[in-house]
Amino acid sequence: MPGLSCRFYQHKFPEVEDVVMVNVRSIAEMGAYVSLLEYNNIEGMILLSELSRRRIRSINKLIRIGRNECVVVIRVDKEKGYIDLSKRRVSPEEAIKCEDKFTKSKTVYSILRHVAEVLEYTKDEQLESLFQRTAWVFDDKYKRPGYGAYDAFKHAVSDPSILDSLDLNEDEREVLINNINRRLTPQAVKIRADIEVACYGYEGIDAVKEALRAGLNCSTETMPIKINLIAPPRYVMTTTTLERTEGLSVLNQAMAVIKEKIEEKRGVFNVQMEPKVVTDTDETELARQLERLERENAEVDGDDDAEEMEAKAED
């Protein structure tokens, strides 16, 4: 089956001052030739004078073939198909927004393209028709090209009735819902922080236990907190949640409570690693670390037992 393709948005060309995502195809004397990724790879050009605000010493340091770049549209000739672009006029804030919009629009595109493949479409016109009857309906409804469809599809995970108004047959609707659920159902993330908690005063380990218990009490039903000992005085705090921001907030809150409690007892609190979302690789490394410590502790216990047995034998 041939690879189907279609632009991301209803309008065939970007407007002047739109910030768009491009892929650099080649570099010539006049400038860089690029493909506009959101507009079915139509060609555009970044003139050399629009690459940087500074004097250009090396083009390759500014732009490279094969790399994606956020650029702003400065001229569009729809009849001739000329699109002039600028890299130097894009602010860091605009680049961040462009990347976010591109990521969400690409997700919608991937969903609809997979729907087309499952339904065995063979023509680009069929894919474009699917866009017209789904993504572009929501983009137009919410007046936010790229975001409208993404937000509607995300909402459809919990409320598929949002798709009822679309002009889809039963097969199209079923395949679309299945693909939306597969791609957009929220994934739980694990959040971790490493802390040091110690008390060298009279209450010692009891003060540490009390402070850690106070931190555990910050758990909620949807965000349970776990605290594991790595090696005194270092502990790892973790929580698993669908809400990344709230998860970070809950761990920060628990750390503040632990700090307050241990310092009341004249103990010490240090943050070794601020709360962050951890990957499977991080988790595997932590599990390996804990396993190694457990093994080392078991070996120490074994040595103690051996010494006791030797002492008894001598008696």
From Swiss-Prot:
Recorded GO terms, molecular function?
ribosome binding; RNA binding; translation initiation factor activity
Where does the record place the modification Phosphothreonine? 279, 281
Q: How is it modified after translation?
A: Phosphorylation at Ser-49 and Ser-52 stabilizes the eIF-2/GDP/eIF2B complex and prevents GDP/GTP exchange reaction, thus impairing the recycling of eIF-2 between successive rounds of initiation and leading to global inhibition of translation, while concomitantly initiating the preferential translation of integrated stress response (ISR)-specific mRNAs. Substrate for at least 4 kinases: EIF2AK1/HRI, EIF2AK2/PKR, EIF2AK3/PERK and EIF2AK4/GCN2. Phosphorylation on Ser-52 by the EIF2AK4/GCN2 protein kinase occurs in response to amino acid starvation and UV irradiation.
Instruction: Kindly name one Pfam family recorded for this protein.
Output: S1
Q: Taking every annotated instance into account, which residue ranges of this chain make up the domain S1 motif?
A: 17-88
**Where is the protein found, in the record's own terms?**
Cytoplasm, Stress granule; Cytoplasm, Cytosol; Mitochondrion
**Swiss-Prot/TrEMBL GO biological process terms:** cellular response to amino acid starvation; cellular response to heat; cellular response to oxidative stress; cellular response to UV; HRI-mediated signaling; mitophagy; negative regulation of translational initiation in response to stress; PERK-mediated unfolded protein response
> What influences the activity of this protein, per its activity regulation comment?
Activity is regulated by phosphorylation at Ser-49 and Ser-52, which stabilizes the eIF2/GDP/eIF2B complex and prevents the eIF2B-mediated exchange of GDP for GTP, thereby preventing the formation of the 43S pre-initiation complex (43S PIC). This results in the global attenuation of 5' cap-dependent protein synthesis and concomitant translation of ISR-specific mRNAs that contain a short upstream open reading frame (uORF) in their 5' UTR, such as ATF4, ATF5, DDIT3/CHOP and PPP1R15A/GADD34.
Q: Which domain of life is it from?
A: Eukaryota
Post-translational modification N6-acetyllysine, affected residues:
141
Q: Which InterPro entries match?
A: NA-bd_OB-fold, S1_domain, S1_IF2_alpha, TIF2_asu_C, TIF2_asu_middle_sf, TIF_2_asu
Q: Which residues carry this modification: Phosphoserine?
A: 49, 52, 158
In this chain, composition skew of type Acidic residues spans 299-308
Q: Which GO cellular component terms, listed alphabetically, does the Swiss-Prot or TrEMBL entry include?
A: cytoplasm; cytoplasmic stress granule; cytosol; eukaryotic 48S preinitiation complex; eukaryotic translation initiation factor 2 complex; glial limiting end-foot; mitochondrion; nucleus
Q: What does this protein do?
A: Member of the eIF2 complex that functions in the early steps of protein synthesis by forming a ternary complex with GTP and initiator tRNA. This complex binds to a 40S ribosomal subunit, followed by mRNA binding to form a 43S pre-initiation complex. Junction of the 60S ribosomal subunit to form the 80S initiation complex is preceded by hydrolysis of the GTP bound to eIF2 and release of an eIF2-GDP binary complex. In order for eIF2 to recycle and catalyze another round of initiation, the GDP bound to eIF2 must exchange with GTP by way of a reaction catalyzed by eIF2B.
Assembly state and interactors?
Answer: Eukaryotic translation initiation factor 2 eIF2 is a heterotrimeric complex composed of an alpha (EIF2S1), a beta (EIF2S2) and a gamma (EIF2S3) chain. eIF2 is member of the 43S pre-initiation complex (43S PIC). eIF2 forms a complex with at least CELF1/CUGBP1, CALR, CALR3, EIF2S1, EIF2S2, HSP90B1 and HSPA5. Interaction with METAP2 protects EIF2S1 from inhibitory phosphorylation. Interacts with ABCF1. Associates with ribosomes. Interacts with DDX3X in an RNA-independent manner.
Question: Family assignment?
Answer: Belongs to the eIF-2-alpha family.
Please identify the protein, giving its name as recorded: Eukaryotic translation initiation factor 2 subunit 1
